[in-house]
Structure formats: structure tokens, C-alpha cells
């Protein structure tokens, strides 16, 4: 067994779980579904997780095409993705992570179909998760790693489905303090992952600048 598979699987799981953040989504989900029955909530959660998974899979497999089409370098995307993920992690560390701010009138507007937006996109499948999916797909050099990535994403959304379905009971068990502690811990993990992502993108660019500088000087002289 390849020794890199387990660390890669752990990276996929921790990063996607913190970015999807089903525990942090629970209070918002309960607010948006206030007055609905458990059956209605379950239907919304099922559709939201399916929509999120399909959306993420589109970016996983179409990431390379999008890079070529828009002329985006992998390293540049790593840097931008690192910044986005770091900002999300920082907000979570402050226990003030809000995937999407909703006013009362907006909640009523989305009540008919909140499973797609805002619950599915961007709460469960936001820019951070999309950036993370594309970057990790770039790092998947073997079919085994690609399989682990896809399987982990499927597992995360399966867990998200069960967590949100049981959100009423979990909120009572965790309480506000427990939810804040969990959010801060996941935020710290996310910030570390973001720094690694940023550095991995910045290193090749800085190396090119360092190599090209002597060449430019010799050309001028």
C-alpha cells in the first residue's frame, strides 16, 4: 500500500469536513426550516447534499479544462484558494462563521426551495470547498488518489446529510458553547491547511523569480 494514501485521505477528510462545516450550518438550517416537519427537513437536506456533491464533482473533473480555458495557472489558483480558505478558517476561529447572512424576508423567499440556494450553494458547497476540490484533484497523481478524493467527498456529504437530519437533537446536546469550541477547532485546522496550500503555490513562483533574476542581470550587463 502506498504510504502517501493515508495522509492524503486524512487531508481530504479534514479539509472538506471543515469547509462543508455541517455543525456550523445547523443553526442556520434550523432557522430557515422553522415551522417545517421532520419529513420536509429531511427532503431539503437530501436534495441539498445531492446538489452540493454533483456541483463539486463538476469542478473536480472540469477543473483542468477551466484552467486551460481561462489561462489560469495551478500555482496561482493555489495561492488564491489558500487565501479564501484562510479567511473562512479565520472567521471560524473567531466563532463568527456565517456562510450566508439571511434577513427575515430572504428566509421567506428561499423557503420554497432552500435546498439549492442558499443551503446547497454556497453554504455546503462554497468557494472554499470548490477551490479545495480543484487543488486536491491537481495533487491526485494516481487513480487510487483520485478514488480516495471522490470517495471522501461522497462520505462527507453522507455525514452532512445525517448531521443536518439530526440537527434538532445535536444542537441541544452540543449547546452554544460546544458548537463554538468545535467551530474554533475546525477553523484552526482549516487555517493550517490554507497556509500549506498558499506556500505550495508560492514556492514555484518564487523559484522562477529567483532563477530568472541572474539571467536578467547577465543580459543587461
For each predicted feature, which ranges?
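Single conserved hydrophobic/aromatic residue that forms the stacking wall/gate
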Residues: 209-221
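Transmembrane-helix boundary and interhelical-loop signature of multi-pass inner-membrane proteins
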Residues: 37, 58-81, 160-204
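Juxtamembrane transmembrane-helix termini in multi-pass membrane transport proteins
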Residues: 8-58
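Membrane helix-loop-helix hairpins that form the core translocation module of multi-pass transporters
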Residues: 42-96
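A small-residue-rich subset of transmembrane alpha-helices
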Residues: 39-64, 140-172
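Transmembrane helix exit motif
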Residues: 84-105, 193-204
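Structural signature of hydrophobic alpha-helical transmembrane segments
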Residues: 9-25, 75-83, 148-160
Amino acid at each position: 500500500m502506498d504510504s502517501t494514501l493515508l495522509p492524503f485521505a486524512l487531508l481530504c477528510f479534514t479539509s472538506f469536513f471543515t469547509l462543508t462545516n455541517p455543525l456550523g450550518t445547523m443553526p442556520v438550517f434550523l432557522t430557515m426550516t422553522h415551522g417545517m416537519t421532520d419529513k420536509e427537513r429531511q427532503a431539503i437536506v437530501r436534495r441539498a447534499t445531492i446538489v452540493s456533491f454533483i456541483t463539486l464533482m463538476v469542478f473536480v473533473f472540469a477543473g483542468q479544462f477551466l484552467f486551460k480555458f481561462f489561462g489560469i495557472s495551478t500555482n496561482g489558483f493555489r495561492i488564491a484558494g489558500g487565501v479564501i480558505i484562510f479567511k473562512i478558517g479565520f472567521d471560524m476561529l473567531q466563532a463568527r462563521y456565517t456562510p450566508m447572512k439571511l434577513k427575515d424576508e430572504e428566509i421567506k423567499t428561499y423557503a420554497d426551495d432552500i435546498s439549492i440556494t442558499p443551503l446547497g450553494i454556497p453554504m455546503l458547497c462554497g468557494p472554499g470547498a470548490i477551490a479545495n476540490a480543484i487543488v486536491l484533484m491537481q495533487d491526485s497523481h494516481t487513480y487510487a488518489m483520485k478514488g480516495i478524493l471522490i470517495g471522501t467527498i461522497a462520505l462527507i456529504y453522507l455525514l452532512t446529510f445525517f448531521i443536518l437530519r439530526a440537527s434538532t437533537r445535536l444542537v441541544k446536546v452540543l449547546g452554544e458553547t460546544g458548537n463554538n469550541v468545535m467551530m474554533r477547532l475546525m477553523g484552526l485546522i482549516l487555517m493550517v491547511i490554507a497556509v500549506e496550500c498558499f506556500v505550495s503555490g508560492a514556492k514555484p513562483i518564487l523559484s522562477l523569480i529567483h532563477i530568472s533574476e541572474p539571467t536578467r542581470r547577465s543580459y543587461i550587463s
